[in-house]
Amino acid sequence: MLLAKKNNLKNEKGMMNMNRNRNILSAVVLCSMVSAMITGCAGTNSASADVNSQSTESKSDIVTISESPSTTEVTEKDEASKTPEVKSPKYVFLFIGDGMSYPQFQAASDYLGALDDPDYQQAEPSIGYEDRNGAVLNGPSLLNFMNFEAAGSAVTYDSCSFAPDSASTATSIATGHKTYSGMINVDETGTKQFETIAEKLHDQKNMKIGVISSVNLNHATPAAFYAHQASRNDYYEIGLELVDSGFEYFAGGGLKKVTGPDKDKENLYDIAEEAGYKVTFTQEDAEKIKAEDEKVILIDENLADSDAMEYEIDRSEDVWCLADYVDKGIEVLDNENGFFMMCEGGKIDWACHANDAGSTINDTLALENAVQVAVDFSLEHPDETLILVTGDHETGGLTIGYAGTDYDTYLTNLSSQKISYSRFDEQYMAKYKENGTSFEDAMKDVETLFGLKMNGDQSDKLLLTEYEINRLKSAYELAMTEYSAESYNQEEYVMYGTYNPFSVTITHILNNKSGIDFTSYSHTGLPVGVFANGFGASEFNGYYDNTEIYNKMAKLLNIQ
């Protein structure tokens, strides 16, 4: 299975350059003639409308007509006056790549470009021309949202850190307010609540709301659109707010702590059903859901680590992905008042925490496929749809470039990875510990699943050096013990973080051999990209604070 596992949802790139000419209503002058027996005078009554729908009257709006307009002219103007004016987008899609900043989507783009480029060279590191044989790099293959009409950057700091968490940054995006890391839609004292854009659209404009995530639906980012808690870890209370929100569509990962931290409370799924939600746990039942079901919660059938959706690299082709949940969400939510849909690619963040570049790229591409569903929908509603793609923060300190590869990258090496670090832990490390498997036998699986070889041709870019083999052996020996990350010394933490020593060393070495590296197991302070397409897209050009994402959406949607 290639790392770049696509869902055949991408259109030709030309479809993505969707600069559309919009028909803007100009001022219409309505005239009536009052004839006098001796002298004639014309009276006018004018109405004007501008592109921002802020109508004003002035002398310049008044037009004096000395002759009666023809019947044809009056009819044409009357018809024009009946044309409905689009004042705000009817359909809004907000895609958030958790942990996705410039390095994540650029790495995915570069990787696709490398796979598609027959001249992409895996030569010895060199900045000269001698080893290139005339080959010329074609460059990255841009992800669909990288071709959007508008592109901006958002600063992500919160009230306590330049390297913030998902709770505070999602709060900024959803409400336009800063707060401390770990807090969801409340101020720094934990006493003042902030109303979210989704809540306002639901209440003020009767728009339907959808919330999708590849991780838990009561995790920090999705929770930021409906919950208000001083701690992001209050999963049960957040789950209760999910039900109380009355939002029409939730889909993706499962709920954490469904019976509370002590497993002594009423099941959240039962509470949801009592509140009128239809809850599904199988793909077959999810496929049967229609708009008539009104309020639904679709839990992915193939939940993996921590009851989240599988990593994209581990997903079978017949299993639903984020794009499928977006597609079903459109079916459920579409109505005359429109809808707002937030879709989170949450496992980008989890993969970056674990320093797994292969899984990171795969889940970034899964988010891109989900975006394509919205793009296809927007082609049917070009003047009514706004699509936004952004991140909440950067995770892992991912960088394209590594000291050991100098000025070169070997990104196609990543195609050798077949499974995520998480699946390797679950399906292989557990077996090794149970059976007392030797290091040499374990390395046979590593070669099959990650391409790293202990023996082979010296020109093979995935052939391990003696130094790398010793790193892997030391990590394996530690992983076979009852190790505890809490007892790590500083050197061990830098090498392994809180992850299985063997699996994280495997991904570190594969990353480095590909010309990729990470600097952290946590978040960083990089700005995130903001890409916009459709109604009001130009508002999102520029460099601004992440609270402005909310402010710009609120302005376009005319909410208080």
Where are these regions (language model features)?
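Extracytoplasmic mature domains of secreted/periplasmic and thylakoid-lumen proteins
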Residues: 177-240
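Sec-dependent signal peptide cleavage junction
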Residues: 37-55
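Extracellular mucin-like PTS domains
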Residues: 55-76
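A post-motif C-terminal structural segment
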Residues: 86-91, 100-105, 109-171, 219-560
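Bacterial N-terminal signal peptides that target proteins for export
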Residues: 17-28
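Bacterial N-terminal signal peptides
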Residues: 29-37
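Short, Lys/Arg-enriched N-terminal segments with co-localized hydrophobic residues
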Residues: 1-17
